[in-house]
Amino acid sequence: MSQPFASRGLAWFQALAGSLAPRPGDPASLRVADAELDGYPVRFLAVVPDPDNPFPRARQGEVGLLEGWGLAAAVDEALEADREAPRKRALPAIVDVPSQAYGRREEALGIHQALAGAVDAYARARLAGHPLIGLLVGKAMSGAFLAHGYQANRLIALHDPGVMVHAMGKAAAARITLRSVEELEALAAKVPPMAYDIDSYASLGLLWRTLPVETVEVPSTADLVRVRTCLGEALADILGGPRDLGGRLGAANREASARVRRLLREQW
């Protein structure tokens, strides 16, 4: 067996869920653990690196075929188990995903369906009353973030340079836009949606809260207390509000989006 890659997602999963090994039957790149948060039942979920993944494109924490379908199955399992329960367990998604898994085999075998399956499961769980919380501890990139975390009622990001959200990595974005990385960074400084830093992303109104920590790679006791407290506050906020994602639309940098939505409603 190869040695595991360093992973913020795995470090925070172990700290919060008190578990390290995958469940029997789950892919080695998926972590699922049931626990409690302020006395409320929760199911923590994370995608982590697996250097022995049978799909080479998914060995460094990418979300691929096994991960997409595995997330969907784990969420559906909770959805079915709690169907008649008065309290639907919360689903905190610990997000540290560098990309979806690009590859010919992934495309041929339907990675679009695997990721859509995860999105669908999360969305159905949220609409059924399961509180969803996304905790961004590392990269939240591209379709991987859409499949794991983006459907959350509340998104929380650790305030650290290694926490970033974007459609693609800088090198790829520079190639696509026919710019150098330096030119891309200069553009990002003026256009928040093009930026990679978490403060620019927060200015778009998508984050519920950013949270400073002392040691993001290896959570300290103080970090763990701070994050668990914030998760508990997010849970209480979700339970007292609507299940939709409308709270993301009010930021000043989303005025154009709000106007487009208003015009579409008027035309409809």
Language-model region placement:
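Amphipathic alpha-helical segments at domain termini/boundaries
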Residues: 1-24, 174, 178-268
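N-terminal short beta-loop-beta anion/metal-coordinating cradle
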Residues: 23-41
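STAS-typified acidic loop motif
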Residues: 38-69
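Structural beta-sheet core signal
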Residues: 44-46, 93, 134
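Short acidic, glycine/proline-rich loop/turn micro-motifs
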Residues: 55-59, 102-107
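Well-ordered, non-membrane alpha-helical segments in soluble/globular domains
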Residues: 64-78, 109-119, 224-231
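A structural preference for short, pocket-lining loop segments at secondary-structure junctions
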Residues: 69-102
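Conserved catalytic cores of soluble enzyme domains
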Residues: 106-223
